[in-house]
Design a protein with these regions (language model features):
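Compositionally biased, intrinsically disordered low-complexity regions
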Residues: 26-30, 40, 89, 115-116, ...
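Unchanged
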Residues: 58-148
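Generic detector of short, locally flexible boundary/turn motifs and exposed helical patches
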Residues: 2-7, 17-20, 44-48, 69-75, ...
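Short, charged, intrinsically disordered terminal tails
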Residues: 143-145, 149, 154-161
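N-terminal strand-loop-strand
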Residues: 2-53
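Residue-level marker of positions within ordered structural domains that often coincide
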Residues: 30, 112, 155
C-alpha cells in the first residue's frame, strides 16, 4: 500500500506594500469667542458616512505644510496659514491588491479666508463640510486617532502644551 504524505500548506501570499505620505490639518476659526474647526464627510467603501479631518497626498515637490494648506483649501474651501505641527498618524489598510502603510502629518492652521465648500475637491471625495466647535469635535470625528489630533489642537490653543 502506498501512502502519500499530505502536502504542506502553502504560506499565504503576502500583498506588496505601498508607502503613502499625506498631510492635512485642523483649520481653526474663532467666531463669537468659540473656536471651530472645519471637518469633512466622506463615504467609506461600505457606503457609511465618516466625518474626518481634511487631508491628502503630497504632490510633486510640495512640502508637508504646503500639502496641508492645499488639501484644507480643496476639501473645505477654507484658506489657512500653518501655525505648527500637531503630530502624525500612521495606519495600515489593504485595497487593490496591496497593503498600504499610510503616514499622515497634521498641522494646526488659522483660517484666513474662503467659505465652506466642497466644490474645490478635485477627487470629489468630500460629500459635506461643516464648522464644528472644537470642544465638541470628539463626538463628531469618526476616528479615534483624529480625535487625538483635535485634542492636541485644543491643548495647543489653550496653552496647555
Amino acid at each position: 500500500m502506498t501512502s502519500t504524505a499530505p502536502r504542506p500548506a502553502q504560506p499565504p501570499r503576502r500583498l506588496p506594500t505601498v508607502e503613502e505620505v499625506s498631510a492635512g490639518g485642523v483649520v481653526i476659526d474663532v467666531h463669537d469667542r468659540v473656536a471651530q474647526i472645519a471637518v469633512i464627510a466622506r463615504r467609506n467603501r461600505a457606503g457609511r458616512v465618516e466625518w474626518c479631518l481634511p487631508k491628502g497626498h503630497v504632490e510633486n515637490d510640495e512640502t508637508l505644510e504646503q500639502t496641508a494648506v492645499r488639501e484644507v483649501a480643496e476639501e473645505t474651501g477654507i484658506i489657512g496659514r500653518v501655525l505648527g505641527s500637531l503630530g502624525t498618524i500612521e495606519y495600515w489598510f489593504s485595497g487593490s491588491g496591496t497593503r498600504v502603510h499610510k503616514v499622515v502629518h497634521h498641522y494646526l492652521l488659522e483660517a484666513t479666508g474662503g467659505e465652506l465648500s466642497i466644490e474645490g475637491d478635485p477627487d470629489a471625495e468630500a460629500i459635506d463640510v461643516a464648522w464644528i466647535p472644537l470642544m465638541d469635535v470628539h463626538s463628531h470625528l469618526t476616528f479615534p486617532n483624529e480625535r487625538r489630533i483635535a485634542q492636541v489642537a485644543w491643548e495647543r490653543l489653550a496653552g496647555a502644551t
